[in-house]
């Protein structure tokens, strides 16, 4: 969802949002298959762009549009 850079580290950020917990927490939507896909995509991007240092983070956003969201940041999540 987002590619950012902090110092010499490129950060791939997956953002997941849920308005209710009926389907689970936002971060629970990142299945093994999704993680594998994210790792492959990040690895390919890093190789193509000669990036040595990178990580994958996750931002989980919970809440309804009419309420203040709860935002959780998972560093090096994948």
Label each PLM-derived region with a short phrase.
Residues 2-22, 32, 38:
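Conserved catalytic cores of phosphodiester-cleaving nucleases, focusing on short active-site segments
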Residues 18, 25, 69:
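Residue-level signal for pocket-adjacent positions within structured domains
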Residues 21-52:
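Mid-chain, well-packed structural core segment of small domains
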Residues 47-78:
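Domain-level recognition of nuclease-like catalytic cores that cleave nucleotide substrates
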